[in-house]
Amino acid sequence: MAPNLRKHHPLLKMVNNSLIDLPTPSNISAWWNFGSLLGICLATQIITGLLLAMHYTADTSLAFMSVAHTCRNVQFGWLIRNLHANGASFFFICIYLHIGRGFYYGSYLYKETWNTGVILLLTLMATAFVGYVLPWGQMSFWGATVITNLFSAIPYIGQTLVEWAWGGFSVDNPTLTRFFALHFLLPFMIAGLTLIHLTFLHETGSNNPLGISSDCDKIPFHPYFSTKDILGFIILFLPLMTLALFSPNLLGDPENFTPANPLVTPPHIKPEWYFLFAYAILRSIPNKLGGVLALVASVLVLFLAPFLHMSKQRTMTFRPLSQLLFWTLVANLLILTWIGSQPVEHPFIIIGQLASLTYFTILLILFPIVGTLENKLLKF
């Protein structure tokens, strides 16, 4: 009998072990769909991005016009651009839900998988930031100026570092050129990191909503979860297409329809919605270095999740107190997102400061305390 090609061919064997015959817990819910959705987001972004790069010119005098040209004169250029810009928003929606799922169900206890995931988040944030600068509108220019300027808060080497990043004494042509190069490179880095992420995941197998070993009850990935994933793709593409076709500029900033002008500062500089929570934390501290440290800590705190887990149970499925805390954290992040979009004035300043304090208190102090308390309650 001839050997099964799918199981013996060096390349097909890898595909088979990770997409077809992969043993998967039978009880994983729709919250486990976001990994594959992130994969499809990445593929969509790389394809649309490649098509956009073919018509883009990374030069300060031509960048804005080249984007306008793509939308006006290139076949379906407007659609490709709208899909790429809004695809980024859906990418972040998926990654935030994916992280939330990992947090709720204790998936962070797979330390290597979790850590590579946090590195992926940081790389995605960097990619989105440099990408936002490319259309060279007002918000692109001033966003780049404000965020890169934060590096100057680093003692001793800060100013040198900023000028090195800019390629001059202000955000100008060299900055745009290198940001384009980085924006082209980073998605492929994300793809590589994704393979590492999956390699670590397949060492342990997926977690499940009960947080207990599921070795005794696993089913093949295909056809069960491959079908479920395709349904997920459809549910993702429907709102993406709706947004791109009906209201493509809903999530953008109107300032970006004005070409970059170093002499005119927009009244309110703010990043895209997916960075607003971190921006609110940055602004809540009235000191430059302190703000930068808080901004960095707001994301890097995720690395500490495995060490702050005190509960005897892995998931929050049967931990009502932790659940209450988790949903308070979600509400808190929504408040931070709202505050980030508001001007720096009363009462937004104090709300932002309280929300920032609450964010770190919940993650670093309350979660471990409540986990320990729930362990004690188990004894009654």
From Swiss-Prot:
Pfam families assigned to the protein according to its UniProt record, in alphabetical order: Cytochrom_B_C, Cytochrome_B
Subcellular localization, per the record?
Mitochondrion inner membrane
What InterPro entries would the database entry show?
Cyt_b/b6_C (IPR005798), Cyt_b/b6_C_sf (IPR036150), Cyt_b/b6_N (IPR005797), Cytb/b6-like_sf (IPR027387), Cytochrome_b (IPR030689), Cytochrome_b_C_euk/bac (IPR048260), Cytochrome_b_N_euk/bac (IPR048259), Di-haem_cyt_TM (IPR016174)
For the ligand (heme b b566), the binding residues are: H98, H197
Entry keyword set: Electron transport, Heme, Iron, Membrane, Metal-binding, Mitochondrion, Mitochondrion inner membrane, Respiratory chain, Transmembrane, Transmembrane helix, Transport, Ubiquinone
- Transmembrane parts of this sequence: 34-54, 78-99, 114-134, 179-199, 227-247, 289-309, 321-341, 348-368
Matching Gene3D superfamilies, A to Z? Cytochrome Bc1 Complex, Chain C
Tell me the superkingdom of the source.
Eukaryota
Q: Where does heme b b562 bind?
A: H84, H183
**A molecular function (GO) term:** metal ion binding
**Which cofactors are named for this entry?**
heme b
The cross-references to SUPFAM superfamilies, in alphabetical order and at most eight, read: a domain/subunit of cytochrome bc1 complex (Ubiquinol-cytochrome c reductase) (SSF81648), Transmembrane di-heme cytochromes (SSF81342)
What CDD domains does this protein map onto? cytochrome_b_C, Cytochrome_b_N
Gene Ontology terms: biological process: mitochondrial electron transport, ubiquinol to cytochrome c
Provide the binding site for a ubiquinone: H202
Q: What does this protein do?
A: Component of the ubiquinol-cytochrome c reductase complex (complex III or cytochrome b-c1 complex) that is part of the mitochondrial respiratory chain. The b-c1 complex mediates electron transfer from ubiquinol to cytochrome c. Contributes to the generation of a proton gradient across the mitochondrial membrane that is then used for ATP synthesis.
Other remarks on this protein: Heme 1 (or BL or b562) is low-potential and absorbs at about 562 nm, and heme 2 (or BH or b566) is high-potential and absorbs at about 566 nm.
Assembly and interactions?
A: The cytochrome bc1 complex contains 11 subunits: 3 respiratory subunits (MT-CYB, CYC1 and UQCRFS1), 2 core proteins (UQCRC1 and UQCRC2) and 6 low-molecular weight proteins (UQCRH/QCR6, UQCRB/QCR7, UQCRQ/QCR8, UQCR10/QCR9, UQCR11/QCR10 and a cleavage product of UQCRFS1). This cytochrome bc1 complex then forms a dimer.
Q: Which PANTHER family match?
A: CYTOCHROME B (PTHR19271:SF16)
Which protein is depicted? Cytochrome b
- Which species expresses this protein natively? Contopus virens (Eastern wood-pewee)
Gene coding for it: MT-CYB
